[in-house]
């Protein structure tokens, strides 16, 4: 089999890249290790930056998002007993974020892929990348027990942190930057109305809290917990009680509890590799970078990578511009590091660090008072939260 662009991974970044390239008349084949049901079963973030929303619209897959998604013009912070609203739109010349779950984004992209008739192969195994430095790289893989070979011009590695794409790059090429945070997030999804119209980020001496939502009838809550905790030790009742202990009474009185649809503990990690390309292999999204979820940047940074890569490939195929191929890594990384910085900043600002000394604790408190107590500080948070601009490719 032959194609122009081979895409490894059928998560939202791989599907979005495939859709944009398909719309531009560029042939793609997507390979995915899991089943469609497994991919849709992943519970992930649900906050879309304004630039991500625009990219989904550009791809022609935003009809349901625009009909069912919730536009948020603000967000709220809690600390030291204070509730601090952040007027996102007022502070960013009218920009906003969209509450629309990653599962729904993936569902829409899957439907668009199926409607296009463009090939996608699920359930592949033993995926291997060959000759990435040549002008005709190939991928071999097993599908339904048969060894298959896919020839292509370019490979997009959209297969996540544990995927084969990054691992296929020879040792000594990539520089890794990593920080593992000393706590995790315990998340609970429930079919209950959100406790607040806007998302709430709360600092508390017992640990950070995020009150999020997927719709007007589905809520997502997170608690900072020790890495040693096991999800089996957290009954629904224990979760709700701990959540109440970290929220003010005015919110507790409005909190609707219920049976959990999903509950899990996720470790927090900051991770980047440089460069994000090796020959004609391009790393996209989690294959190249991971952020703690505090800044809602994971899916949005993946979409940012897609934005740069699809435009570079369009220029190559439509205008013969091979000079832009080498620019992908630097373009993507410039925005990745800004997203990493904001995620690091939000995590440092709002979590409880048991091992920090008294001076660091005072500095953390001073940061909260400054950033959440001045228009300049609130503007910094707002412009990063709604998403920084993407550089033009051509």
Specify the residue positions occupied by each region the protein language model found.
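Glycine-rich FAD pyrophosphate-binding loop
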Residues: 22-43
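C-terminal helical "tail/cap" subdomain of flavin- and related membrane-associated enzymes
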Residues: 253, 296, 311-394
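Extreme N-terminal starter segment of soluble prokaryotic enzymes
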Residues: 2-5
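Conserved mid-domain beta->alpha element of the FAD-binding
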Residues: 8-23, 109, 262-345
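Conserved FAD-binding catalytic core of PHBH/FMO-like flavoproteins
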Residues: 111, 118, 124-128, 132-264, ...
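Active-site-adjacent segment of FAD-dependent monooxygenases/related oxidoreductases
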Residues: 41-44, 49-116, 130, 340
């Amino acid at each position: 089999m032959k194609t122009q662009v081979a895409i490894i991974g059928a998560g939202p970044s791989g599907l979005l890249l495939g859709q944009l390239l398909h719309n531009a008349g560029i042939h793609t084949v997507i390979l995915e290790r899991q089943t469609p049901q497994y991919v849709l079963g992943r519970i992930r973030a649900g906050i879309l930056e304004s630039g991500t929303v625009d990219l989904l619209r550009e791809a022609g897959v935003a009809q349901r998002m625009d009909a069912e998604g919730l536009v948020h013009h603000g967000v709220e912070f809690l600390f030291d007993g204070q509730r601090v609203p952040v007027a996102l739109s007022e502070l960013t010349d009218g920009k906003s974020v969209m509450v629309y779950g990653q599962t729904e984004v993936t569902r829409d992209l899957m439907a668009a892929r199926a409607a296009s008739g463009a090939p996608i192969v699920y359930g592949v195994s033993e995926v291997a990348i060959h000759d990435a430095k040549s002008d005709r790289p190939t991928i071999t893989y097993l599908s339904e027990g048969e060894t298959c070979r896919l020839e292509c011009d370019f490979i997009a590695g959209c297969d996540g942190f544990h995927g084969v794409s990054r691992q296929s790059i020879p040792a000594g090429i990539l520089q890794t930057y990593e920080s593992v945070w000393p706590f995790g997030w315990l998340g609970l999804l429930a079919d209950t109305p959100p406790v607040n119209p806007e998302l709430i980020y709360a600092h508390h001496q017992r640990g950070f809290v995020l009150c999020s939502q997927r719709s007007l009838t589905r809520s997502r809550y997170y608690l900072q917990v020790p890495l040693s905790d096991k999800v089996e030790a957290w009954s629904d009742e224990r979760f709700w009680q701990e959540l109440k202990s970290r929220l003010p009474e005015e919110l507790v009185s409005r909190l609707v509890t219920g049976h959990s649809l999903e509950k899990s503990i996720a470790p927090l990690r900051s991770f980047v590799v440089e460069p994000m390309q090796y020959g004609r292999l391009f790393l996209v999204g989690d294959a190249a970078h991971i952020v703690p979820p505090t800044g809602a940047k994971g899916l949005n940074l993946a979409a940012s990578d897609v934005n740069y890569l699809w435009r570079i490939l369009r220029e190559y195929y439509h205008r013969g511009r091979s000079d832009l191929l080498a620019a992908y890594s630097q373009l993507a990384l410039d925005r990745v590091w800004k997203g990493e910085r904001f995620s690091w900043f939000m995590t440092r600002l709002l979590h409880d660090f048991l091992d920090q000394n008294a001076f660091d604790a005072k500095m953390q408190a001073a940061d909260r008072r400054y950033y959440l107590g001045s228009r300049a500080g609130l503007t910094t948070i707002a412009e990063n939260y709604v998403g920084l601009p993407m550089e033009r490719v051509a």
